[in-house]
Amino acid sequence: MRDQPLGEFLEQLAARVSAPGGGATAALHAAQSAALLGMVARYSDGPKHAEHAVTIASVLAEVDVLRVEAVRLAEDDAVAFTAVTDAYRLPKGPERSAAIAAALAGAAVPPARTIAVAERLVALAEVLLPVANRNVITDVAAAADAARDRKSTRLNSSHSLPSRMPSSA
C-alpha cells in the first residue's frame, strides 16, 4: 500500500475481496492524521513559535514515527485478513478450525494497535492545538477527526475475534 497509487488502492478497496478493508482503511486514516499533524508542526516551527519549540519538536518527532507505523498497520491488516480468508478456504476439519482460530486472533492485532496509535494521535492533536500556527489550525481539527475514526476500528477488531469461529469449522 505504501507505494500503491491512490486510485489503484481505491479500486482494490471497492472490489469484492477481503483485503484491504475497514481495518486497513482505519489505519490509513490514522496515517493521514499523523501526516496532517506533522504538517501543522512544521508550519508552527519557527521564530514566531520559538517559546513552544520543544513541544512542537516533540510532537513532530512522534507523529512522524506514528505515521510510518500506521501505514505498516494498514499493510499488516490486509495481510492478516487474507490469512483469514485463506483459512476459511481449507477443507473442513480440525486443521481448518485451528487455522481459522489462529488467523482470527492474528487479524485482531493490527486493529487493536491502530486504536492505540489513533488515541495517541488525538492526544498529540490536543497538545499541538494551543501552540500551532493559526493559519493551519483547522488541519489540527481534521487530523483529530481522522484519528477519531478509530471507533470503526474497534468494530473491526471485535469482529475479528474468535467469536466468528464457526461451530462446525
Q: What residues fall within each predicted segment?
A:
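Ribosome-associated translation termination/rescue signal centered on the conserved GGQ peptidyl-tRNA hydrolysis loop
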Residues: L37-G38, R42
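Short, hydrophobic/aliphatic alpha-helical segments
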Residues: M1-A19
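Amphipathic alpha-helical interface segments
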Residues: D77-A146, R150-K151
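Short, charged, low-complexity loops and linkers
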Residues: L13-A24, A57-V65, S97-A108, R134
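Conserved small/polar residues in nucleotide/adenosyl-binding loops
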Residues: T153-S158, A169
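A structural-propensity feature for long, helix-poor, extended segments
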Residues: P47-L90
